[in-house]
Amino acid sequence: MRTRLLAAVLATAVLTSACGSDEDKPLTDAQGQWVDAFCGALVPGMKAGLELKAQDPADAKAVKAAYLKLVTANTTAFVDAEKKLKELGAPSDELKDVHERLMKYVSESARSYEAARAPVEKLEPNAQFWENAEKALADTSQVSRPEELRATFDALEKSPKYSAAIGKSVPCGELKSGGQR
C-alpha cells in the first residue's frame, strides 16, 4: 500500500512539474512585442497631452491645434495597437482574459477619439474651447470600462516575468518617465 501511495505521489509531482506555468518559461519575442504594443498604444497620447498642457491657455488657436493633435495621436495609436495586439494574440494562457479586456478597451478608445474629432474641429478656438472639447470627448466616449487599463497594468505587474518585460520595454519606459526618455 505504501509503495502504491508513494508511486502515486511521485507521478503526481512529475506531472504537475511538467505542466509549469508561463512564468516558468523565458519571455518570447511575441510576448515582448505584446508588452511593447500595450505601452506603445499610450505613448503618443501621453506626448500629445504633454504638448497640450504646455500651451498658453490664452492662445486658444494653439490650444485647439494641440487638442486636435491629441485626438489624432490617440486615434492612430489605438487603431495601430488594436491591429498589432490582435495579430499577436494573448501573450499566454494565463493572460487571455487580460488580453480580451485590453482589446475591448483599445477598440473602444480608438472609436471614441475618432468620434470626438469632428465635434472638436467644429469648436471655436476661444476661452471656453478646452472645457467644450472635454465635453465633446466625454459625450462621444464609447469606453465602457476605463478601469480596464489600470487592471491590465496591475495584472502585468503581478507577474515577475511581465513586470520585468515592462521594465525592459522602451515604450513602457517612456510612459514611466513621462516621455522624458
Predicted features and spans:
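Immediate post-signal-peptide N-terminus of mature secreted/exported proteins
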Residues: S21-A73, C172-R181
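A charged, solvent-exposed segment within the mature domains of Sec-exported extracytoplasmic proteins
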Residues: A118-R181
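Short, solvent-exposed, charged loop/turn and helix-capping segments
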Residues: V79-M103, A115-A127
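C-terminal motif of bacterial Sec signal peptides marking the signal peptidase cleavage site
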Residues: L15-A18
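Amphipathic alpha-helical coiled-coil segments with heptad-repeat character
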Residues: D24-T28, P57, K64, S92, ...
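Generic structural signal for well-ordered, non-transmembrane alpha-helical segments
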Residues: D36-M46, L50, L68-V79, E100-E114, ...
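Bacterial N-terminal signal peptides that target proteins for export
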Residues: M1-A7
